[in-house]
């Protein structure tokens, strides 16, 4: 992408002028949009670590996170992005988090309680007061079962509200159990409706967006399988009528979002302005349940280096 892209220009102008969220000299709203994807989230974790190393946190006005991307956004706003990246290859890649044997015990394969109660509190403690007090709000995308659409959760008043939203956005259907109840609604993983919270950021008024993708450049999701259609969708539909159809549309919804990003990236004349960062097309995609520490660590390093290489040359 051209070095004079409007998103890069805004990041550069704000970085060099010392602009910060509480004293902006421009009229724009720059959002950091972070994709998740379970263990693929290590990619966007490495990217926010790169932004942190360049001292670029203060150039953003809002951070939007979906699924694992919300966790990465929280560590980023706490000033712990590099620290937070290590959870993928030191904590989450263990049987404490992913354990297929739990199926035989009638329990979810993915143990989110371990993340919220152990990793974020004891093993790799998130400094949550910094997230709550940040002048840059964290807005977390979740999937509402009541409305069958994505919803933004924000304005967290305490640790419990923040962790509850993180729990909901990462609640993968079936793999990590059933819906999470918050305020009279039930929520599941953001990926049901919006794995990449671009449209949420647009509706929230962003004029510029830096989008961190966790799949290699040019990747697209494959169509739903017969297993999806005749088993998983029917199971999920028990939670809410119509939810199974939403589940089956996930690949199309995701691919349409990527096509929209591709189209908008090329338009440097009319806003809103979007630009995305992703690993090269020939990079081997990670599984969302990847447990190989070496592959995860390498993905984090490559992603951090990518961000530094692209943005450092412009600063």
Region annotations inferred by a language model:
Residues 65, 69:
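Gly/Ala-rich beta-loop-alpha elbow adjacent to hydrolase catalytic centers
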Residues 1-63, 74-315:
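Patatin-like phospholipase
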């Amino acid at each position: 992408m051209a070095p004079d892209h409007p998103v890069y220009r805004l990041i550069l102008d704000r970085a060099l002028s010392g602009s910060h969220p509480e004293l902006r000299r421009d009229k724009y709203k720059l959002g950091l949009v972070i994709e998740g994807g379970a263990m693929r989230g290590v990619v966007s974790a490495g990217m926010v670590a790169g932004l942190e190393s360049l001292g670029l946190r203060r150039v953003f006005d809002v951070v939007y996170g979906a699924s694992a991307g919300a966790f990465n956004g929280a560590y980023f706003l706490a000033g712990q992005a590099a620290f937070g990246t290590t959870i993928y290859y030191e904590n989450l890649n263990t049987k404490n988090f992913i354990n297929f044997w739990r199926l035989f015990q009638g329990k979810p394969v993915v143990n989110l309680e371990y993340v919220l109660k152990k990793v974020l509190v004891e093993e790799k403690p998130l400094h949550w007061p910094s997230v709550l007090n940040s002048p840059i709000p964290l807005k977390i995308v979740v999937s509402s079962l009541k409305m069958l659409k994505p919803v933004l959760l924000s304005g967290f008043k305490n640790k419990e509200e923040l962790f509850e939203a993180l729990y909901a956005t990462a609640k993968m259907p079936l793999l990590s159990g059933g819906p999470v109840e918050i305020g009279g609604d039930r929520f599941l993983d953001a990926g049901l409706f919006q794995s990449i919270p671009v449209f949420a950021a647009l509706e929230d008024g962003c004029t510029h967006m830096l989008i961190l993708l966790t799949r290699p450049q040019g990747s697209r999701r494959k169509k739903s399988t017969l297993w999806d259609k005749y088993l998983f969708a029917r199971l999920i539909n028990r939670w809410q009528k119509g939810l199974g159809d939403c589940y089956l549309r996930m690949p199309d919804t995701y691919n349409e979002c990527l096509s929209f990003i591709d189209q908008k990236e090329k338009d440097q004349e009319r806003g809103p302005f979007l630009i995305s960062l992703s690993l090269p097309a020939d990079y081997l995609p990670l599984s969302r349940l990847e447990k190989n520490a070496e592959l995860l660590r390498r993905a984090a390093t490559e992603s951090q280096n990518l961000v530094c290489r692209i943005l450092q040359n412009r600063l």
